[in-house]
């Protein structure tokens, strides 16, 4: 699946047991692919071409794929759901802080958070690395994060098994003290 054009990430949950899993919700003896990017029909074909016989794929996106006899088989998978992230950052600057410093900090945070995978949590303390590596001439005096436009959190953000972090520079507020 990862070799397909446009596919950026894939996570596959497998259930080899006789009992359905609750979270992630994987029926017994099946697998649950979650795919970011790519064309639905190509993804379904790749799953069909590589899945074991008699094992069902699971998900809310279902497409028919023809076997060598022309018989259609339902192939299922999911797409990750975007989880918006908002950051409010308060910094104190000195005379060496560049005029584009705010943009550099925002870009560094967007670059870092865009590397997180499907279901990968946002770890609060790790945000300081891209912030501090963006430029010099400042220090962070406060930071809050969250999933709404007025973030108040100072702890990690849990990302569910089928979610992916969605961040843009406009979701990052930089204030000065």
Regions found by a protein language model. Give the residues of each.
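Carbohydrate-recognition loop of C-type lectin domains
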Residues: 2-120, 176-177
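Short acidic amphipathic segments
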Residues: 1-16, 89, 127-146
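An aromatic-glycine-centered, glycine-rich loop/turn in mixed alpha/beta architecture
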Residues: 78, 97-177
